[in-house]
């Protein structure tokens, strides 16, 4: 039987960013928290990171939030917006019929996102990291709130476009189109470095979603086994001439730690 308070609270999942600045949730020592990140931004870049974060909020709230977000940036190395972590409902995969969505496909995505952030599942749930130390679902809690609001409104003839946790909006599509198109970690490997990625991540313009964190479909180690198998199968088809009906039987794979 569903917990009545949880079901009632779940009705608020589509509220988006509250009109008024919410109270700061208590720091929860019962969950693991991500360690502070390296300080990689200059003073001018920190101002840019603040502007990027404040774009989600009305101008009249910027003065109140800027100091808090700067403190997060200076102590943690990223702006997480802990103040906006929802507490009215339990963060877990609820029965799909409990989600206040117009589209069951959208409700299933909401369920998957909440599963990725479930404290019983995620590595650092309050920092929106599912696994691997940096496998992020979103960059901050404002993005989570906006995405849940969009998914509540979505119909089966719309597509939500995501860019490293940032929702670009709902776009007209068709019932045969994807409900969500996700991109993460948009870096050019041969023209970039780890330091450059960390800088852009601290600025709030890119995130690393790992294989199944930023795509909302983490199912534990079996997901990585599945993804790795598909990767190897496609490599064998491309380089060994396997057709679509052949498996990897008889193929020797040598790895240096994959």
Q: Model-found features: residue ranges?
A:
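Intrinsically disordered, low-structural-confidence terminal and linker regions
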Residues: 1-104
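Glycine-rich adenosine-cofactor-binding loop
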Residues: 248-258
């Amino acid at each position: 039987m569903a917990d009545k308070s949880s079901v009632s609270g779940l009705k608020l999942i589509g509220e988006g960013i509250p009109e008024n600045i919410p109270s700061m949730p208590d720091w929860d020592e019962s969950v693991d928290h991500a360690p502070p990140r390296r300080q990689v931004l200059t003073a001018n870049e920190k101002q840019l990171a603040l502007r990027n974060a404040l774009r989600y909020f009305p101008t009249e709230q910027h003065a109140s939030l800027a100091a808090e977000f700067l403190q997060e940036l200076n102590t943690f190395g990223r702006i997480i917006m802990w103040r906006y972590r929802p507490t009215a409902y339990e963060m877990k995969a609820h029965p799909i019929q409990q989600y206040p969505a117009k589209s069951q496909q959208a409700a299933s995505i909401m369920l998957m996102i909440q599963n990725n952030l479930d404290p019983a599942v995620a590595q650092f749930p309050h920092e929106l990291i599912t696994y691997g130390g940096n496998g992020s679902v979103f960059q901050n809690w404002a993005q989570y709130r906006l995405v849940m609001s969009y998914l509540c409104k979505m119909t089966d003839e719309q597509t939500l476009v995501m860019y490293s946790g940032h929702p670009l909006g709902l776009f007209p599509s068709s019932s045969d189109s994807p409900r969500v198109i996700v991109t993460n970690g948009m870096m050019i490997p041969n023209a970039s470095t780890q330091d450059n990625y960390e800088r852009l991540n601290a600025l709030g313009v890119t995130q690393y979603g790992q294989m199944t964190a930023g795509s909302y479909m983490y199912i534990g180690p079996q997901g990585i086994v599945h993804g790795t198998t598909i990767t190897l199968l496609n490599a064998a088809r491309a380089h060994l001439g396997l057709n679509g009906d052949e498996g990897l039987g008889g193929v020797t794979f040598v790895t240096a730690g994959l």
